[in-house]
């Protein structure tokens, strides 16, 4: 049976999006996993905890015996059925546990006895994790161009359209502002870093690229933070600033934060609950910057938001949101971004409207 155990093997797995049958307990998987992994554990959280306690108190032989006792009979058969189905569905996949130790070898041997030969990652998740950390450190050394600009300038779309672009906000499942949450929950920090490394590896393998195109992000994107090695390189990078007319920015923001988010919430939750979730999303975003707005201004904008939602529910029109969005941009977001940009003015190498910046980046 094959085993994968070299650095290049691990990178090849990530680049190919090789399906990984991860047999660690759910709690381990939630703390960090590879992008193409599915969790089909040998032991659930309670079983793992019991075996761990037994190991500390009585040693490895007793712990192994307890594990076999806990995963036996109908429980073992149910898990075997799940592994067998996953192997047949993913014939090019691979098994993985924490360190390539007993759990993946036990599952591999049980599958072999059932007539299925399936490879495993020698070194397990720990080896893959070290690979993603090292890959990010290495790939972050390539030159970087950052796309900057005020809220609504289409920075993310511009990055997405570049063959050497990596959408950090998309990977983080967050758009980086108080209103940045999406309907997808954010990944754990380790899983986010693994996903980022895999995306960088795949992009580099496709392009053999000379430089990265990234959005000008702060250290935090929602609850995820950028790896320090990448963040440090970004602080030294050249910046191209998108300067689109205010009206165009409003159109983009209307599409992204009102029309699309309303659609996404109602699609996910149904009309009634979806509407409530959408309203809560907008109120939560405004509330998150209450202290910076000041209580009086926050209350004024919150009242305008309520009025806009009432109009939208009655007529379907999102035009009413301009009454609070315009002052929010002019009084808060735009001054904040300009202040941040002033502190790194020497890094700005190009300014222009969206299409001009896209053309400039393409020529790099």
From Swiss-Prot:
SUPFAM superfamilies: Rhodanese/Cell cycle control phosphatase (SSF52821). Keywords: Selenium, Transferase. Its EC number is 2.9.1.3. The active site is at 97 (s-selanylcysteine intermediate). GO terms for molecular function: transferase activity, transferring alkyl or aryl (other than methyl) groups; tRNA 2-selenouridine synthase activity. GO terms for biological process: tRNA wobble uridine modification. NCBIfam families: PRK11784.1-1, PRK11784.1-3, tRNA_sel_U_synt. This is tRNA 2-selenouridine synthase. The gene is selU.
């Amino acid at each position: 049976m094959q085993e994968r155990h070299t650095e290049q093997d691990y990178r090849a797995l990530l680049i190919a999006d090789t399906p990984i049958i991860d047999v660690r307990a759910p709690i381990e998987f939630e703390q960090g996993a590879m992008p193409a992994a599915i969790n089909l554990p040998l032991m659930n959280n309670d079983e793992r905890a019991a075996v761990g306690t037994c190991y500390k108190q009585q040693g490895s032989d007793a712990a192994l015996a307890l594990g076999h006792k806990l995963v036996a009979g109908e429980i073992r058969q149910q898990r075997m059925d799940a592994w067998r189905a996953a192997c047949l569905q993913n014939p090019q996949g691979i098994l993985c546990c924490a360190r390539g130790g007993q759990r993946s070898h036990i599952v591999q041997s049980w599958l072999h006895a059932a007539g299925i030969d399936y490879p495993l990652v020698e070194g397990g998740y720990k080896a893959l994790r070290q690979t993603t950390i090292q890959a990010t450190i290495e790939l972050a050394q390539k030159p970087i161009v950052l796309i900057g600009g005020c809220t609504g300038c289409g920075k993310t779309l511009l990055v997405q359209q570049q063959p050497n672009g990596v959408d950090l906000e998309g990977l983080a499942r967050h758009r980086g502002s108080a209103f940045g949450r999406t309907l997808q929950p954010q990944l754990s920090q380790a899983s986010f870093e693994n996903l980022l490394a895999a995306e960088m590896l795949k992009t580099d393998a496709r392009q053999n690229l000379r430089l990265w195109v990234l959005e000008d992000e702060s250290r935090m994107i929602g609850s995820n933070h950028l790896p320090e090695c990448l963040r440090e390189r970004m602080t030294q990078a050249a910046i191209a600033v998108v300067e689109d007319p205010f009206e165009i920015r409003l159109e983009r923001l209307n599409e992204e934060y009102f029309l699309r988010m309303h659609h996404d919430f109602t699609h996910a939750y149904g009309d009634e609950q979806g509407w409530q979730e959408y309203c809560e999303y907008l109120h939560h975003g405004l509330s998150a910057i209450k202290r910076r707005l000041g209580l009086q201004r926050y209350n004024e904008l919150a009242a305008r938001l309520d009025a806009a939602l009432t109009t939208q529910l009655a007529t379907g029109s999102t035009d009413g949101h301009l009454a609070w969005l315009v002052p929010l941009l002019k009084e808060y977001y735009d001054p904040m971004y300009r202040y941040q940009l002033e502190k790194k003015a020497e890094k700005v190498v190009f300014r222009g409207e969206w299409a001009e910046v896209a053309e400039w980046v393409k020529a790099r």
